[in-house]
Amino acid sequence: MSGLIQAAKSLLLLEFVDAFFLAMRQFFSPKPTINYPYEKGFVSHRFRGEHALRRYPNGEERCIACKLCEAICPAQAITIEAGPRRNDGTRRTVRYDIDMVKCIYCGFCQEACPVEAIVEGPNFEFATEMREELYYDKEKLLLNGDRWEREIARNILMDAPYR
């Protein structure tokens, strides 16, 4: 009996008709892709993108040269040189370099920082033509922090209940 039913389905081309209607249903459904350079997709507040050094609202850099980020980095992509202690007993960095070629974007540096100085910001479009441009120094990191501070602060605030 099942052979007879199978022969009838084949004769009436039911599989073809089912496939045709499935294709038509998908053809008129909304497209799942976006037109990337002109449209941006959703980026989570936990996204780990381009690194940035943050400043306090008074303009002073946050990094206290504790070197925890350098110690915890599994790729050894961070190099820090601390300056001499200032009159108030605090230290600041003289050199803060990140080799973005080595970085694996794990976020350990951000988690280890006690003053939220080093963060991975929301920027994911930092492709370059020269490899040397992926060696970030302190000035480049501070510029990134200044450029993305509003979004970085919002992302940290949104993630605060889970820390």
UniProtKB/Swiss-Prot annotation:
GO cellular component, one term: plasma membrane
Binding site for [4Fe-4S] cluster 2: 73, 103, 106, 109
Main subcellular location of this protein, as a coarse class: membrane
Subcellular location: Cell inner membrane
Record-listed E.C. numbers: 7.1.1.-
GO molecular function, one term: 4 iron, 4 sulfur cluster binding
InterPro entries listed in its UniProt record: 4Fe4S_Fe-S-bd, 4Fe4S_Fe_S_CS, NADH_quinone_OxRdtase_chainI
Cofactor note: Binds 2 [4Fe-4S] clusters per subunit.
Annotated keywords: 4Fe-4S, Cell inner membrane, Cell membrane, Iron, Iron-sulfur, Membrane, Metal-binding, NAD, Quinone, Repeat, Translocase, Ubiquinone
Domain called 4Fe-4S ferredoxin-type: residue spans: 53-83, 94-123
Pfam families found in the cross-reference section: Fer4_7 (PF12838)
Listed GO biological process terms: aerobic respiration
Enzyme class: translocase
Binding site for [4Fe-4S] cluster 1: 63, 66, 69, 113
Cofactor: [4Fe-4S] cluster
Catalytic activity from the UniProt record: a quinone + NADH + 5 H(+)(in) = a quinol + NAD(+) + 4 H(+)(out)
Alphabetized PROSITE patterns for the sequence: 4FE4S_FER_1, 4FE4S_FER_2
Residues spanning the signal sequence: none
Disulfide bonding pattern of the chain: none
Keyword Metal-binding: yes
Function noted in UniProt: NDH-1 shuttles electrons from NADH, via FMN and iron-sulfur (Fe-S) centers, to quinones in the respiratory chain. The immediate electron acceptor for the enzyme in this species is believed to be ubiquinone. Couples the redox reaction to proton translocation (for every two electrons transferred, four hydrogen ions are translocated across the cytoplasmic membrane), and thus conserves the redox energy in a proton gradient.
Family per similarity comment: Belongs to the complex I 23 kDa subunit family.
Subunit structure: NDH-1 is composed of 14 different subunits. Subunits NuoA, H, J, K, L, M, N constitute the membrane sector of the complex.
Protein's name according to its UniProt entry: NADH-quinone oxidoreductase subunit I
Organism: Bartonella bacilliformis (strain ATCC 35685 / KC583 / Herrer 020/F12,63)
